[in-house]
Every structure is written in C-alpha cells, then in structure tokens.
Curated annotation (Swiss-Prot):
Name of the protein in its database record: Glycerol-3-phosphate acyltransferase
Catalytic activity, EC: 2.3.1.275
Function, in words: Catalyzes the transfer of an acyl group from acyl-phosphate (acyl-PO(4)) to glycerol-3-phosphate (G3P) to form lysophosphatidic acid (LPA). This enzyme utilizes acyl-phosphate as fatty acyl donor, but not acyl-CoA or acyl-ACP.
Domain of life: Bacteria
Main location: membrane
Annotated GO biological process: phospholipid biosynthetic process
GO molecular function: acyl-phosphate glycerol-3-phosphate acyltransferase activity
Organism: Chlorobium luteolum (strain DSM 273 / BCRC 81028 / 2530)
Amino acid sequence: MMTLLAILAVSYIIGSIPTSIMAGKMLKRIDIRQFGSGNAGGTNAFRVLGWKTGLSVTLIDIAKGVIAAVSVVAFFRMHPIGAYPDINEVALRLLAGMAAVIGHVFTVFAGFKGGKGVSTAAGMLIGIAPVSMLIVIGIFLLTVWLSRYVSVASILAAIAFPLIIAIRKYVFELGGGLDYYIRLFGESFSFHDSLDYHLMIFGLIVALAILYTHRANIRRLISGTENRITFGKSA
C-alpha cells in the first residue's frame, strides 16, 4: 500500500507542473488563465502564446502522462517501499497516469486551477497503448487541421480511443496486446502495446470526462462562438 501511495503521490506532483502558466509568466509575464479561454492548457497556450509555445507546452504536458504511466511505475517496481499491491499492471499504470491528470487539472502549484487534462491523459495512454494512440493522434491532428477547432479534435479523439481498442481486440482478435521490438543506435528496445480490457473501460470513462470538461466548448460550438486556432502566429 505504501508503494501504491508513493506512485500516486509522485505522479500527482509530476502532473501538477503548470507548464502553460510557467510559459506565460516567463515569456510574457502574464497569467494565461486571464486571457483567451481562461484555461491553463495547451490549447489556450496556442491562442495566447503562439503555435510554437503552444506546441512546446502540449508536448511537455504529454510527457508528464508518459512519465507517470511508464517511468514512475517502473522505478517503484525496481525500488519498492513496503508491500507491493497485487494489482493488474495496466490498471496500475492507469492509476499512476490518472494521478498525473488530476495533478494537471488541480495543480497544487497554481491554486488547484489547471488545464483540462487532455494532453496529459494522451501521454498516459501513449505509454500504455502506443499503437492505438498513434491512430488517435492521427485523428486528432487531421481534425485540427481541417476544422481549426482543438476542442472538436479532443472530443473526437477521446471517443475514438475505446472504439479502436475494442476493434483491435475483438474484430482483429489481437488478444491482450502485442510486443514490438525496435533497434536504435545499435541497441534493441521492446515495448508492449496493451489491449487490456481495463483500457476500454477507462477509455469510456475518459470520453465521458472529456465531454463534461468541454461542455462550455460544446455550447460555444453550437452558438458559433468557439475560438479557432491559427498556425501563422508565433511567440
């Protein structure tokens, strides 16, 4: 139990790093939450700080999820403290990743007012199911490019994830997942692309959560007042 609590605590702290808020204060000496949509996430960083900074913020927020789901769990596997909980590996990584997402949304470093958690959740799932997430990222990027609405892309990507897991697992009968091997710089690396049923359940919950956190965006989309991003502005 102590190990599980340590994993969740470290993951929460990693997720709490307020990337967009730090970028706003360092680059323009502003609180990004007072501009644009008022959200402390990558999407608002694109609007307020420009696409280069927005992209950097988004990538760092994604990395927070990857680190929580992969590195933190792996570290405590090698250096356990107390009794290790008897829990499914994928479920454990999901718990660690969710702790990071909660940290991003309710950051302890910025008055518990952070972003919406989309990028950090994506990072967590990249660490657990990278192939499925590559498909989801493709859907996200294509939707952003065609519509210029990051909110629409986020919603569609969230809905697509559990569907992709289900199709790969049951239609293509890939079971619990696949192991992949790559060779870089003369070294061989392996990674597991999970199709565990926990992912489908989690994916459905995330899709509902994304719809809930984007309810204001949905209202603006219906009224035609939702902000579009541009790719010509830089900071």
